[in-house]
């Protein structure tokens, strides 16, 4: 069927554009520019705010920066660069450490107030009058909580959190009250953008995801939604996303607990709602639980995936409830995506490869590529 059968309202591309150059996936200099622009300016998800315990500080990565996130004894969150303003030493040496009212540098014992980062003590050093303690506190990092998720931003003047479908998309889910009950991590040998690319199209679905195509039948056609198909019109009837009898992304399609009561009939019928939060995460809201996935760059050719499953307390209180079993379905899909991303990355290393040529169904990849290039422009 020729692309002329594409409806103007369809998201399909009307041409086959080139992708990013090969250097975008392998070159250390390109990667460094991404860290200095995209990941230094955008809000980066680092987990659920409720999962940061009181009187503890945790070391997290935001692009090229190491950041301390802490919650003090009174429950207040704060974030600072993990670098002592004195001579630059790391402050938090482990993934997580106890913290009281002070953060003390392990090198020269300079002490800083945990709540606001003020320099409190220079320990054995005796500064001269030209040293202003008020100008040498910890360097703060902006933080914001959205739907219970904690985001950090390295920019001195951060803008709003960006979400592809808007920040109100999950308003009918009880997001703030959800509890994290399962955690899964995987390191994959590919560039961080390669995983975003496989997330952004379904041409690969028929060959890579048999279980997912069974759960979401339209994926077996190589499209993410009906509007991508040639011949589609806005007058076509809206059909449920999930196979008959399925209500959620679980191995048997059955809800793992009570369906969230605030959802609209359309949200229940859809079975899932994706929220994309470039560059660091996406959230998938089902009728009975929510999954978050963070994409953490580790280098030009290495990426960490961090997935967590969040449930209502009444779901967790069910006798015999097993969050790991609920997570099994999505783990299958993510492992398949990870293996395919690695396969693609290895192939792109070929001397014969220079750049991709995107298909009309890969409109979301094209949009992502344009976003990456625009965000790498120097700040105005």
Model-derived regions: residue spans:
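Generic structural signal for secondary-structure transition and capping sites
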Residues: 39-43, 89, 204
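Basic/polar N-terminal segments that are highly enriched at the extreme N-terminus
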Residues: 1-12, 377-380
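Short clusters of hydrophobic/aromatic residues that line enzyme substrate/ligand-binding pockets
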Residues: 46, 52, 91, 119, ...
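C-terminal catalytic domain of Rieske-type non-heme iron oxygenases
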Residues: 71, 76, 82, 144, ...
